[in-house]
Regions:
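Ligand-binding pocket scaffold of soluble enzyme catalytic domains
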Residues: 12, 20-22, 29, 34-35, ...
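N-terminal beta-strand motif that seeds the catalytic metal site of vicinal oxygen chelate
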Residues: 1-22, 75-78, 125-163, 175, ...
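Vicinal oxygen chelate
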Residues: 2-4, 7-16, 47-50, 66-91, 93-146, 175-195, ...
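Generic "edge-of-domain/loop-turn" microfeature
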Residues: 18-20, 40, 54, 67, ...
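Core segments of cupin and vicinal oxygen chelate
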Residues: 2-55, 94, 102-109, 154-195, ...
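Conserved donor-binding loop and adjoining core beta-sheet/short helix segment
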Residues: 35-37, 52, 59-69
Length: 267
């Protein structure tokens, strides 16, 4: 990919019911999710998410019995671009992170699942350019478009260490912040590649579990909330306005994966 090193280049839902996930996210975000596995996925139940504009919104992986027994649970997970997965693994583990899954070489590139020093999981990936597209760029993230991931948020028990870790390995810059009160401290904005791509905050019991949460662009946050509740999801934080004027609702899907929707309040 021609994205800057450290970019968010893919998002994946691990779920116990891919068909139910397709119905839910179709209603809430408007995505189309394939009704059968990708035949090139090597026997795994892996399905692609398609946006209304024909672009890709990420993927859906059905959790198998073996994966569940090894600790997999419904969750969204991000892929960060690195130029060399082996080198990234060495650097991350030397800096207190962990390798959760060894490097795998797939038709789309090299991947490995890792965790930061506080335990938040994510993938590192060195992608293979699509045939005939040497300058292809991943556009699953956008700061303002519906049906893209618009915000990447990390809750961490050690905010200072997380800030330094992601700066060293992925070039995240957290130079601006806003106060969140005495219990949560500052909310640190993440800038990368000239864009404001997300934020970091202190993990606290009242703020829910730690790790990464991803916020999908919606055309109406109010409509997204209604769709979440009507389709078996659970709203974990009600509609609220955020800096810049957009509105956000946080939720879990029917299988328990955490996510949010951000956009105009709408009707």
């Amino acid at each position: 990919m021609s994205n800057p090193a450290g970019s968010f280049i893919w998002y994946e839902l691990m779920t116990t019911d891919a068909n139910a996930a397709a119905r839910f996210y179709g209603a809430v975000v408007g995505w189309q999710i394939a009704d059968r596995p990708d035949p090139q996925a090597g026997g795994k139940d892996y399905r692609h998410i398609t946006r209304d504009d024909g672009g890709s919104g990420g993927g859906v992986l059905q959790i198998t019995k073996d994966m569940h027994e090894q600790g997999a649970h419904p969750a969204w997970i991000a892929y960060l671009y690195v130029s060399d997965v082996d080198r990234a693994l060495r650097a991350i583990t030397a800096d207190g992170g962990r390798a959760l899954m060894p490097k795998m070489t797939l038709p789309v590139g090299d991947i490995a699942m890792v965790a930061d020093p506080m335990g938040a999981p994510f993938y590192v990936m060195t992608p293979v350019q699509p045939p005939g597209q040497p300058d292809a760029v991943s556009d699953v993230f956008s700061v303002d478009k519906p049906q893209h991931v618009r915000w990447n948020e990390l809750r961490s028990p050690d905010l200072a260490r997380a800030t330094a870790f992601y700066a060293r390995h992925f070039g995240f810059q957290c130079n601006e912040s806003m106060p969140m009160g005495p219990q949560l401290g500052d909310y640190r904005f993440i800038d990368h590649g000239g864009l404001r791509v997300g934020g970091m905050m202190k993990q606290a019991d009242v703020a829910g579990p730690g790790g990464w949460t991803f916020y999908f662009g919606g055309r109406s946050a109010s409509a997204a909330k209604r769709a979440i509740e009507a389709n078996g999801g659970t709203v974990t934080m009600d509609l609220h306005q955020v800096p810049g004027g957009d509105w956000v609702v946080s939720a879990t899907d029917p299988q328990g994966a955490r996510f949010g929707v951000v956009g105009p309040k709408g009707e």
